[in-house]
Amino acid sequence: MLDMKKLVKYAGIAFGVIVLFCGAVIGYCLSQPEPEGFPILEYHMVQAEEPKEAAAYNVPVEDFQQQLDYLQAEGYTTISIRDFLRAKKGLQELPAKPVILTFDDGYRTNYTELLPLLEARNMKATIFMVGNDIGQDKYLTWEQLRDMQKRGIEIGSHTANHLPLTDMDLATAREEVKLSKLLMEWNKVDTIYTLSYPNGKFTPELRDMLKEEEYLAAVTGDPGYNTFDTDPYLLQRTNIPHPTFGLLEFKWRLLKTRIWTQLGINQHIQ
């Protein structure tokens, strides 16, 4: 039986091998040309005051400002999913370095704190709403939602009740995506054609069902760059949670997205 000293020694060796391997992979990826495509970033809440609930999903305003400024300094230009779909059809050109900012759930701070930050930088974003949460407690009101859309914010669906579509039968899932779309359009929110899968979970059957329900695109929780060859119903997305290590963590998540793309991990190519 191994004694504790040998266990520690072997554990140290194993850790060292893992570090060297990861370093070699990162070094190799960085030595190669950056892959084609662009990232889609997944946010939830931007709020100055730390919320009691969903704190892990809140990006404080100061951190978010740093992230936006970093993106602009690196030459990124925000686009909407609509812009991407139009460019895919040859109806418009994309900027040299596009990025899409998305926000799930539709918190009210998207209007009070996020919108001014975006408008000050002439940036776009897409917000995915849970239909039955609109107007409730800490979520956007109908009036705010319509105003944001008039001011250039793209609105999409996050289903009617934010339940994982993979946990229900296809008929129930169909009602979830159909009801959310109809509810917003009935309340004078312009045509809804994009969806964010709750918890990022999907199946081939769900993907096909969205197309049948006249959605044009959907985002997952799988990181990676998006190109015109990416399945529009399985767009790659990089999660940006509450930062523990400030801007350095944000840069790492962007780098990880690049590496995932170069290694071909969970890339949804048509």
Where does each model-flagged region fall?
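C-terminal active-site subregion of NodB/CE4 polysaccharide deacetylases
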Residues: 2-10, 18-101, 107-109, 167-270
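Cell-envelope/glycan interface and biosynthesis
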Residues: 28-29, 111-112, 124, 129-130, ...
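Histidine-centered catalytic micro-motifs
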Residues: 42, 154-162
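Residue-level marker for buried hydrophobic side chains located in beta-strands
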Residues: 101-102, 155
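Acidic (Asp/Glu)-rich catalytic clusters
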Residues: 115-123, 140-157
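Short beta-strand and adjacent tight-turn residues that come in two discontinuous sequence segments
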Residues: 128, 158, 218-220
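Short histidine/acidic/glycine/proline-rich micro-motifs that form metal-
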Residues: 131-135, 164, 198-201
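Charged helix-capping and loop-helix junction motifs
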Residues: 138-145, 172-176
